[in-house]
């Protein structure tokens, strides 16, 4: 992989250490759909995957992020990171972005379309979180938010024919790893064929549950944050986490 060579040249010692990693890789894994919450949290994981000859396809789907300006900054940084390594990057709201609302009188501008897509996606996320607005961080609202994003990621993996998906959320020490893994496992189960689904032709997908905080990846994340001069957010993303920081 071209990006594998590029990464190892940046830091030979760390690449060698990663090769000796004790992280368990599913047998036969060659590609993984990697849900990315942000560029900083993705950086060390992507480097690790490439060092182990696993192709990451980055999927950016985070309708929880508020406000729109913050969302656009984080998305742009994620895309910049992927493009710098020649890695495929998929916009989770790409279908909405590509649609053009036209009439006899006007064609929707790019700026208006971006704003409409963001507002629509965030409103749907808020509806899914209804009733949990006052829950604390790492509580039941976060668990539901993880599942909301993992379900869409699982569906995208199934659509693309990629048998495994994972998430960079599992790299954050501020998040509950058990909640994240439970959300991923449930999402994989919910998109698969059920025992009674006679004639079901949907391909099974699997969640790669992993603690991406181990093996020096947290320290490597911090180093890459400076190396790439990434924007480093100060709160999780949603308005509720933003208020909890104020």
Role assignments for model-derived ranges:
Residues 4, 11-99, 113-193, 201-246:
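Nucleotide-activated chemistry modules centered on ATP-dependent adenylation/adenylyltransferase
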């Amino acid at each position: 992989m071209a990006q594998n060579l590029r990464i190892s040249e940046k830091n030979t010692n760390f690449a060698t250490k990663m090769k000796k990693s004790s992280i368990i890789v599913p047998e036969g894994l060659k590609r993984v759909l990697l849900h990315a919450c942000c560029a900083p949290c993705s950086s060390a994981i992507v480097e690790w995957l490439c060092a182990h000859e696993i192709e990451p396809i980055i999927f950016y789907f985070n309708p929880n992020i508020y406000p729109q300006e913050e969302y656009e900054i984080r998305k742009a940084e994620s895309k910049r990171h992927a493009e710098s390594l020649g890695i495929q990057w998929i916009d989770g709201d790409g279908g909405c972005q590509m649609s053009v609302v036209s009439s006899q009188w006007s064609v929707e501008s790019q700026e208006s379309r971006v704003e409409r897509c963001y507002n629509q996606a965030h409103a749907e996320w808020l509806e899914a979180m209804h009733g949990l607005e006052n829950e604390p961080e790492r509580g039941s609202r976060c668990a539901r938010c993880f599942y909301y994003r993992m379900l869409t990621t699982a569906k995208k993996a199934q659509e693309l024919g990629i048998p495994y998906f994972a998430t960079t959320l599992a790299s954050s020490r501020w998040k509950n790893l058990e909640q994240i893994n439970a959300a991923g496992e449930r999402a994989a189960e919910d998109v698969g064929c059920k025992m009674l689904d006679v004639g079901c032709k949907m391909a099974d997908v699997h969640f790669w549950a992993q603690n991406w905080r181990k093996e020096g990846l947290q320290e490597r994340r911090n180093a890459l944050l400076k190396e790439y001069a990434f924007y480093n957010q100060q709160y999780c993303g949603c308005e509720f986490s933003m208020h909890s920081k104020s």
